[in-house]
Amino acid sequence: MTESPIVLDVEIRNWVVIPILIVLFIVSALKLNISRIMQINSGKPQDVEKTMQMQTINRVRRLVSFYNRIPQKSFFIRKAYLCGTTGSKTNKGILSSIAPTQEDSNPMNMMFANSMFTDPSGITDMLKGNIMHLIPQVTMMSWVNHFFSGFVACKLPFFPLTIRFKTFLQRGIEMGSLDVSYVSSLSWYFLCWFGSEGINAILLGENMVSADSQLLQSSIEPGPPTQQTPIHKIYASEKENIEMIRYDSLMTNIEDRFLDNIKKKTSFDFNQINKNNNNNNNNTSNIKPKPIKSNLSNSKQSKRITYQKPSSLI
């Protein structure tokens, strides 16, 4: 026995489903702008030396990933700038400019150095982020639960779901006989909240991190900080990666490879087309021009035009 589908009112779509979507997008945009303002006004000083080191590491990794897209001369210039010139005492390269530092004998001191336990601004920023994600979600959930409680908002047009999804898709509706594919208003809000990350990234122009993952990370108690790798060891490993590269340009024979890809995707035989074009050109060159006949003989056969005098007036 098949169950007859429930016909939902159009007003539910206009006054429940669409308003939740619009308000959720507006709240996401406001949350993003407020978080940017809070980051600008935080005034946390940045270490210039560490910033330069991170930019150097990013530059080296980009070169390792995309070295075959630049000319060979440009690659060797960058390699000499980063790794230095072999046999030269003056040009040792940026990656060899930092000398190894004396490491602390106690590893716990190294682990807790430059961590959030010694830097109070890190704890402040973490609290600000948690507040910025927690307050809008609690407010939105209370708003939906107060104004739209008890509504069957929509039906999922998917394959039949199991009974395990009932507690997630029908929050606020206590009906055991209702099909699992029907979604309540509160569950519709949660579905939109979990699935709005990609839409916000496209419309707002920002790669936003999902709020649920940030709330999950903030709820977990932080453990001891991990030991940071010294910068000279990172430089040494990146230098080895550059020196292991054997340059092979991606632009070599790119025309032939492009034509091969087209041949694989299409059924055209370009060699046969070229032969046909050459044969057509040869045929047109072998055709002799026909002599043009003059039309002077036709002029002799033209009719004579006679002129008659008008009759005299009486």
Curated annotation (Swiss-Prot):
It is found in: Endoplasmic reticulum membrane. The chain crosses the membrane at residues 15-38, 131-146, 186-204. Keywords: Endoplasmic reticulum, Membrane, Transmembrane, Transmembrane helix. Residues 39-130, 205-314 are cytoplasmic. It is a multi-pass membrane protein. It comes from Dictyostelium discoideum. This is ER membrane protein complex subunit 3. The gene is emc3. Component of the ER membrane protein complex (EMC). One of its GO terms (cellular component) is EMC complex. Its main location: endoplasmic reticulum. Residues 272-293 have a biased composition (Low complexity).
